[in-house]
Amino acid sequence: MTIDEAIRETEVPSVVADGQGMITYVNARFEAVFGWSKDEIVGKSLTIIIPRTLHDAHHLGFSRFLVTGKPTLLGQALSLRSVTRDGREFDAEHFIVAEQRDGQWAFAATIRPLR
């Protein structure tokens, strides 16, 4: 999957973030599942959809990738928890990719709820 493919995705929630971990795009399915509108969530940190107990691990992995450029979790299905706008946590399959765009890292993920 590429970032452009994630943007075109309509059946599964998709989110795109910049190299600072700020959300730059979500699709309509993301809005429906997570309860956030694009206007509300674009510009917010990815941690808004990550359980608080996973924030440290997220920051560590994100920083490590930005320093080394070596992925450990990208390009594979990951079973992780996500958080909706109302604070409800749910299990989901995350598939995360990264690409360099104009010399900057960008990230995209599809987040398929496991219900």
Predicted regions, residues:
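Core hydrophobic beta-sheet residues of small sensory/regulatory alpha/beta domains
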Residues: S14-D18
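PAS/PAS-like sensory domain cap-loop motif
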Residues: F30-I41
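PAS-family sensory/regulatory domains
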Residues: E40-D56
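PAS/LOV-family and closely related PAS-like sensory domains
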Residues: R52-D91, Q100
